[in-house]
Amino acid sequence: MPSRSISAPVPVLAPAPIVSSLVPAAPSGHQNKTTRIFPPFVVAGAGAGFSLFITLSVCFCKFSRKRSSPPAENASSSPRRPSPREFSYSSLRRATGSFSQANRLGQGGFGVVFRGTISGGENVAVKVMDSGSLQGEGEFQNELFFAAKLDSPHVVPVIGFSHDRKRRRLLLVYKLMDNGNLQDALLHRRCPELMDWNRRFLVAVNIADGIKHLHSLEPPVIHGDIKPSNVLLDSLFSAKIADFGLARLKAEQVEISVAPERDGDGSMVEEVESVVTTVTGYEDFNFGLVDQSPESVAKVPGSVSASPEATTVVSVSPEMGEKTDEDGGSVVVMKKGKESESKDWWWKQESNVERGRVKEYVMQWIGSEVKKERPSRSDWIEAAALSSSSSKKLEKKTSKRLDWWLSLEEEDENKKKKKRRMVREWWKDEYRRELAKKRKKKKKMTLEAEFCSDDGSSSVSQWRRGSGSGSSIDWWLDGLSGERWLRARGNSHDSVSGEIAKSCGISSTPSMRGTVCYAAPEYCNLDNNVSEKCDVYSYGVLLLVLISGRRPLEMTGSASEIQRANLMSWARKLARRGKLVDLVDQKLQNLDQEQAVLCIKVALLCLQRLPISRPSMKEVLGMLKGEVNLPELPSEFSPSPPLKTTRKQRR
């Protein structure tokens, strides 16, 4: 029994604590479950949101860069364009139909252009150049050099090239422009699309944008031959600049000054500041006119001091090259106003100051040579004592020498007479020329007086033309006077028919100095003073041609058209009268007069004589688009005040 009493409560008491222990265990187990599940979920959500934010920010940055990158690429897009590929001569021959005349597009300055279709169905223009001429080879190298550097929608791209050594042919392949060049479309075919003012104004803006792109490169590219025949039109009549045969990179001028050094005597030797012209990135091509003749190269000795104010050019002849001074160099630098002393008579012969004394040095030298050969009196006495026959021989020799001396004097006198006669004849010719010039000048003054009386306004360029010489290289700036045109009409009938006018607009360029009427005055000189302002001047002429629909020089044959023959001179006269609207092409449709007058004023600013006075192409483009305010025209283009009439003139 006691065992039963002890074992009986055990099953009764055991469940009670178990139940009590399990009741509070439920909430504790619930708390452990919440701490293990919710924190990882929150962390995962936060991480996902943060990663999503990062991806969105990266995508936004890439999208913004894509939108802002095209202008930067256009500014420096030279490496983007692929280099021209080489074609075989046979493939280009098949593409052009064996260069048939039916596919001929025109004649350029250095070759004939043919139309062709290469593999893939792409239409191209193939220019066949003559490799025998130096100008053709220069253009070929220029085109290939600039092909990979110029990448602009306003520049005609070069697709490829070909060089046939057997036939000595150089070929360039361009992208075909469907509407040809601006010269043909505007002045010959008279395309109806260009009769709309908006289309013509857009062509002017496209050309300005293309030139601005060339000038914005580093180093700047100078086209050198901007004219309508070098502007091509695509299917949408968008203008593109072509023909980089005369293009060049702008040269950088670096002044190198050397400190003065002391000579051995203690005197200061002045060094002349030299200007070194360098072209960056253009070492393989040399398009300047360099004189490499032996007469132009001379060695300057270290002992001769040259001052900056007194350097004169002396031509070095082969005879002079043989004689050198102690330092081993020929004397080739002289000072103005001071005669360089030398022991050699030939150096004095080259001096301009002592030309009249050349004969004296020659006579001294001849006399010294005769004295060397002439025997002395003692020799004559000894010879007479020895034998009489030898004395007779000596007398004969001396008589011959004296006769030779007299013959030289007679020749000198004859030369003097001939020279005097030539001088007299030269004086007569000069006098006749001066009389003829005076007569022409009087005729000009009468014509200008009649012109001023008709206009009622004075002309600045006419006054310059009357005071200046008529043989200036920039004669087209001042305009052709009526006397010149009348004289041309009397001499030839071709000038009346317009052959002279056509010569200024054809695409051929006979020289490496640009095209007449489009080249700037400083570009026509033989110095290397070439800058971007040369293209600005050419663009001014092209802008006047585009607005007026006339050539720079055009003569129809009527006497009333004489004053309008020179387009630049006529524009200046209209600016002084305040009638710029008269210059606009009368066949234009939808004309905006304010915009047309703006274009003419911009062209006049580009046609200023001094390069520093002309605006840059960036400013020109800003003026045309209205982004830059148009400056006032110079006083020579502004309308002149009315003439004051006195009482005596009224009576």
UniProtKB/Swiss-Prot annotation:
Location (main, coarse): membrane
Coiled-coil segments: none
InterPro entries: At4g25390-like, Kinase-like_dom_sf, Prot_kinase_dom, Protein_kinase_ATP_BS, Ser-Thr/Tyr_kinase_cat_dom, Ser/Thr_kinase_AS
Cytoplasmic-side positions: 62-651
Residues bearing glycans: N32
Region named Disordered: 66-87
Origin superkingdom: Eukaryota
Enzymatic reactions: L-seryl-[protein] + ATP = O-phospho-L-seryl-[protein] + ADP + H(+); L-threonyl-[protein] + ATP = O-phospho-L-threonyl-[protein] + ADP + H(+)
PROSITE patterns to which the protein is assigned, alphabetical: PROTEIN_KINASE_ATP, PROTEIN_KINASE_DOM, PROTEIN_KINASE_ST
Signal peptide residues on this chain, from the entry's feature table: 1-25
Principal EC category: transferase
Transmembrane regions: 41-61
Protein's membrane topology: Single-pass type I membrane protein
GO MF annotations in UniProt: ATP binding; protein serine kinase activity; protein serine/threonine kinase activity
Annotated compartments: Cell membrane
SMART domains: S_TKc
Stretches assigned to the Extracellular side: 26-40
Any single GO CC term annotated in Swiss-Prot or TrEMBL for this entry: plasma membrane
Amino acid composition bias (Low complexity), ranges on this chain: 69-87
Presence of the UniProt keyword Metal-binding in the record: no
Protein name listed in UniProt: Receptor-like serine/threonine-protein kinase At4g25390
Family the UniProt entry places it in: Belongs to the protein kinase superfamily. Ser/Thr protein kinase family.
Binding site for ATP: L105, G106, Q107, G108, G109, F110, G111, V112, V113, K127
Domain Protein kinase: 99-633
Keywords: ATP-binding, Cell membrane, Glycoprotein, Kinase, Membrane, Nucleotide-binding, Receptor, Serine/threonine-protein kinase, Signal, Transferase, Transmembrane, Transmembrane helix
